[in-house]
Amino acid sequence: IIGSGLSEITRKYTNFAYMSTMSKYQIPYTNACIRAFGRRFAISTKDAYLYLRKFRGIAFLVEFYEAEHLQSIEDAVDDLIIYCRNNGGYLS
């Protein structure tokens, strides 16, 4: 969540194992996906991040970045919804 003013949240909740494997392009892409996810459900960026982290959406974005970044952000959000739902998420 670079540049979002959430540095305290980032320090508290970020799994730095993800950060060490992310390229300089993945970080802004992940940030954009988190923000778009929040907009889709009218929730804060913080809540979107916490939800995606809890239901493995962040891990999904990291693992499948090579395929996901070629699609639109909206398509990535659609994929996140499905992936999180398959991991116990409740937003749809």
Q: Predicted regions span which residues?
A:
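Short, Lys/Arg-enriched N-terminal segments with co-localized hydrophobic residues
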Residues: 1-21
